[in-house]
């Protein structure tokens, strides 16, 4: 007697592409600390332009932008009308916010399961295989997002700003040395640090010649002089 033919059942499955998204925000704070080069006194009334050198970009498939994109202009202030006049002030502040966003899409998968003795069993196995594949594809997309965010955070962990004095207060001059009137500063994310900017002061040279009032000839003997400068706090001339 011939053996009965066993019916075999198969089922195909297909897992569509999965998408994941992610984002983060950074802030960058800059506090100007304006001082005089030699005396270290605080300098009010200096106008400083601060601007991110790069304002937007793309990293690992995601994009970022900083706001405000343009320059911010600040003026130092904070002097107090007391004996600490020269020690207080020289302050100004500005801040920026950065946003990064990325979306990643996985590949697709498909397959076939079987044989099974019933179509119901084959369909159930196909559904299970499809669900497992979808979960893996979701993980694949999310891992890609996580990697992109990590790369972006590393790259944007500090950004450069133009830090430049545009208006010099009366009595001072621009300084072109270290921490001078024109700088490029690197600002770490999520900080609000002080950035020193120095001013030179006006300088002059005085040549004194002692002469005889009658002959007009220069007197060779030593002469002693005292030089005074005006103090804005006391309202008096003070010896230098």
Feature names for model-found ranges:
Residues 1-240:
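Solvent-exposed loop/turn and edge beta-strand elements of beta-rich ligand-binding domains
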């Amino acid at each position: 007697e011939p053996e009965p033919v066993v019916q075999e059942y198969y089922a195909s499955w297909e897992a569509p592409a999965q998408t994941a998204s992610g984002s983060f925000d950074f802030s960058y704070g800059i506090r100007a600390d304006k001082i005089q080069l030699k005396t270290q006194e605080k300098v009010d009334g200096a106008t400083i332009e601060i601007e991110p050198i790069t304002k937007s970009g793309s990293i690992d498939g995601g994009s970022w932008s900083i706001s405000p994109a343009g320059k911010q202009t600040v003026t130092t202030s904070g002097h107090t009308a007391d004996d600490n006049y020269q020690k207080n002030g020289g302050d100004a502040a500005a801040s920026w916010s950065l946003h990064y966003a990325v979306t990643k899409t996985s590949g697709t998968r498909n397959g076939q399961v079987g044989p099974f003795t019933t179509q119901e069993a084959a369909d159930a196995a196909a559904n299970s295989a499809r669900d497992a594949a979808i979960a893996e594809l979701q993980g694949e997309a999310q891992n890609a997002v996580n990697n992109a965010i990590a790369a972006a955070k590393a790259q944007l962990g500090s950004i450069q700003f133009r830090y430049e004095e545009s208006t010099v207060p009366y009595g001072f001059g621009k300084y072109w040395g270290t921490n001078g009137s024109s700088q490029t500063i690197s600002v770490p994310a999520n900080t609000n640090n002080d950035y020193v900017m120095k001013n030179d002061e006006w300088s002059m040279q005085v040549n004194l010649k002692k002469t005889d009032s009658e002959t007009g000839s220069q007197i060779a003997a030593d002469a002693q002089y005292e030089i005074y400068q005006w103090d804005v706090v006391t309202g008096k001339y003070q010896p230098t």
